[in-house]
């Protein structure tokens, strides 16, 4: 008799995706972050669901409803902080996952890669609208400043901003629709993640060598299921430590003050995971130019397959490109730091240099390094 997992229409899909899937025998721990992202998404949807049961999306009661969750709901403080810090963990995993894709040339699976870029955009949108919901000072002013950037779009800008706000300022209508978006978007992310996996399983996983591994495959279960479970266990340990010992480490103290349209905080800044893009936005004096640079800082990932010039797929055997990759990582960390600093010298200059270097590395230096390395192979 055929095993039910191989014959049942639903189980068959799961079997081909997680049990009998042929996987390269040499994929390292950098390949764990896909499953960790799946875990983060499930944690966020579950904690978010329980938070939504007690939250009210009204400007008069939103802040006090979050206080009520933390003080009066059974383990409400835990659910709230797991959700808030889970978002940070989500982005850490996202950045590492995308970084691994760049390092090992996984972007050459262009369908999988481009869906990943779309997923990154939607996740950033979800996190942004979610940050507005507690209706603290930074929530309100963050929403005002970031949505206002759309007014830089020629002709339709100001109309578009008022349309998103649902009025002439960030108010009740804005909060209600942001809550609606924040509730629906994670399910769209989950659906797209399935499409992401579908395209990945069309080609099979890449591996650290960047070589075709058809001759040396092992079944996903039990080898990689155990490996993924270990990764999940360690990640949950990290999240638990953060939530129980310093839950406000990555948050902004200003968000413990209720939103006040008449009082602007001295430094308006988004959550830490947007700071690199925010620094690029601020480094350009022109408003429209800044918005274009902000969008391009993420959209640039979509053209990475077109910028690949090397004969090698992975950076494992390409020392010059390796150096440039780690300079790019350092540059992103520098931008993240600058995004959280006030707009004054020397931070302005450092931000401008780091922004130019960011685009220069991806668009010019890495493709040139690939060509140089091709030439060196022939010697």
Curated annotation (Swiss-Prot):
Major localization class: mitochondrion
Encoding gene, per UniProt annotation: MT-CYB
Keywords: Electron transport, Heme, Iron, Membrane, Metal-binding, Mitochondrion, Mitochondrion inner membrane, Respiratory chain, Transmembrane, Transmembrane helix, Transport, Ubiquinone
Annotated positions binding heme b b566: 97, 196
Name listed for the protein in its UniProt record: Cytochrome b
Cellular-component GO terms for this entry: mitochondrial inner membrane; respiratory chain complex III
Pfam families reported in the protein's UniProt record: Cytochrom_B_C, Cytochrome_B
InterPro entries to which the protein is assigned, alphabetical: Cyt_b/b6_C (IPR005798), Cyt_b/b6_C_sf (IPR036150), Cyt_b/b6_N (IPR005797), Cytb/b6-like_sf (IPR027387), Cytochrome_b (IPR030689), Cytochrome_b_C_euk/bac (IPR048260), Cytochrome_b_N_euk/bac (IPR048259), Di-haem_cyt_TM (IPR016174)
GO molecular function, one term: ubiquinol-cytochrome-c reductase activity
Sequence similarity: Belongs to the cytochrome b family.
Note: Heme 1 (or BL or b562) is low-potential and absorbs at about 562 nm, and heme 2 (or BH or b566) is high-potential and absorbs at about 566 nm.
Subcellular location: Mitochondrion inner membrane
Single GO BP term: mitochondrial electron transport, ubiquinol to cytochrome c
Organism: Macroscelides proboscideus
Metal-binding recorded as keyword: yes
TM annotation in the entry: 33-53, 77-98, 113-133, 178-198, 226-246, 288-308, 320-340, 347-367
Binding residue positions for a ubiquinone: 201
Described purpose of this protein according to its UniProt entry: Component of the ubiquinol-cytochrome c reductase complex (complex III or cytochrome b-c1 complex) that is part of the mitochondrial respiratory chain. The b-c1 complex mediates electron transfer from ubiquinol to cytochrome c. Contributes to the generation of a proton gradient across the mitochondrial membrane that is then used for ATP synthesis.
Oligomeric and partner information: The cytochrome bc1 complex contains 11 subunits: 3 respiratory subunits (MT-CYB, CYC1 and UQCRFS1), 2 core proteins (UQCRC1 and UQCRC2) and 6 low-molecular weight proteins (UQCRH/QCR6, UQCRB/QCR7, UQCRQ/QCR8, UQCR10/QCR9, UQCR11/QCR10 and a cleavage product of UQCRFS1). This cytochrome bc1 complex then forms a dimer.
Note on cofactor: Binds 2 heme b groups non-covalently.
